[in-house]
């Protein structure tokens, strides 16, 4: 089985409690990102094997395993697991590293 990292999306950021996104829940924002990756790549949601989300500050609405909650909000099947990685400012990079080390491909062939 080949592992394929087919796409990624990043949520916008803004000053706390200000701007057009101030009232949007973080799990909703991440769910929209997941939907966009599925749309861009024309994926069948049932073909998604995993969702790994980097979250610098998992508190409030984003403190309840935002990777799992967002995947469900995005309409992925409940059989698709979701995971949240917290390494503060390095959360997104750690999520990519986690993906690479949990994929079935040999580590020495990663380019």
Model-derived features with residue positions:
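Conserved "HGTGT" condensation-loop signature of ketosynthase/thiolase-family condensing enzymes
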Residues: 1-80
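Active-site nucleophile and cofactor-binding loops and adjacent substrate-binding regions
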Residues: 63, 82-91
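Solvent-exposed alpha-helices and their adjacent loops that cap or buttress functional pockets
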Residues: 77-78, 88, 103
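Conserved beta-loop-alpha segment that forms the PLP phosphate-binding cup at the N-terminus of a helix
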Residues: 89-99
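Conserved small/polar residues in nucleotide/adenosyl-binding loops
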Residues: 101-108
